[in-house]
């Protein structure tokens, strides 16, 4: 039997400030809380994911950091510096604030799922249109197409900007897989290196966690209906359930 490989999820957009790090860190925290062995890869020179993980309490489920933004020393190869522990099951990749076409050659390598956060503003919608077109036409993506999902991020429901964003997303041939609110909750959790799933006692966290469960379910379904091969589940010590089922427990 072939050895299971880690599921690699890329969080990417060509524009900065759309919440890539918030999505990446919360997704890593969610999988860790559900019992997966998780690695968080930080490609951003600002090192926001790295800083988030440095604030994470030892009492919370651990997450392995790969500081891909750091320059390696004279006697250390990049591959060695970014090596993964053998037991890792989920790899979440946080990308730089601006991603050029040439960057996608490296970032798309070995990726299984792509998530594109998008903000509800005219500027972000136009930039998002260009990036998604660029992504789907990129040689690396065409050579190895994988599921792509859009995340409507920092949304205030029933506002004009929200309505415009949803109309735009309805016109795309790419699914909108989650809608996250513009909430101070994310800022507060980030200061402690935590995610939405780490604060089960908070009512606001519980409501937002429902949308995260929707995202996890989409990822599960995308992998189940894809041709990726063996899909790694939670650690054997835990009952076998999908991520979305675990999230609703």
Over which residues does each language-model region extend?
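P-loop/Walker-type NTP enzyme "switch/lid" segment
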Residues: 3-18, 25-102, 109, 191-194, ...
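Conserved catalytic-core segment of NTP-binding enzymes
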Residues: 9, 34, 39, 96-182
């Amino acid at each position: 039997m072939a050895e299971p490989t880690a599921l690699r999820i890329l969080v990417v957009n060509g524009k900065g400030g759309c919440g890539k790090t918030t999505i990446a860190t919360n997704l890593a925290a969610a999988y860790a809380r559900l019992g997966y062995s998780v690695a968080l890869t930080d490609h951003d020179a600002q090192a926001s994911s790295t800083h988030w993980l440095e604030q994470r309490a030892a009492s919370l489920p651990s997450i392995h950091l790969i500081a891909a933004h750091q320059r390696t020393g004279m006697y250390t190869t990049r591959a060695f510096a970014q090596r993964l522990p053998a037991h890792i099951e989920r790899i979440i990749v946080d990308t730089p604030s601006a991603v050029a076409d040439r960057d996608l050659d490296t970032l798309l390598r070995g990726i299984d799922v792509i998530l594109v956060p998008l903000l509800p503003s005219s500027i972000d919608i136009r930039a998002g249109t260009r990036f998604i077109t660029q992504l789907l036409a990129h040689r690396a993506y065409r050579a190895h197409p994988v599921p792509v999902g859009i995340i409507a991020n920092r949304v205030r429901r029933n506002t004009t900007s929200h309505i415009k964003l949803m109309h735009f997303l309805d016109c795309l041939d790419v699914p909108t897989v989650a809608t996250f609110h513009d909430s101070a909750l994310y800022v507060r959790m980030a200061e402690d290196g935590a995610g939405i799933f780490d604060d089960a006692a908070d009512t606001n966290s519980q409501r937002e966690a429902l949308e995260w469960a929707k995202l996890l379910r989409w990822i599960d379904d995308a992998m189940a209906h894809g041709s990726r091969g063996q899909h790694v589940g939670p650690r054997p010590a835990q009952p076998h359930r999908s991520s979305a089922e675990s999230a609703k427990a």
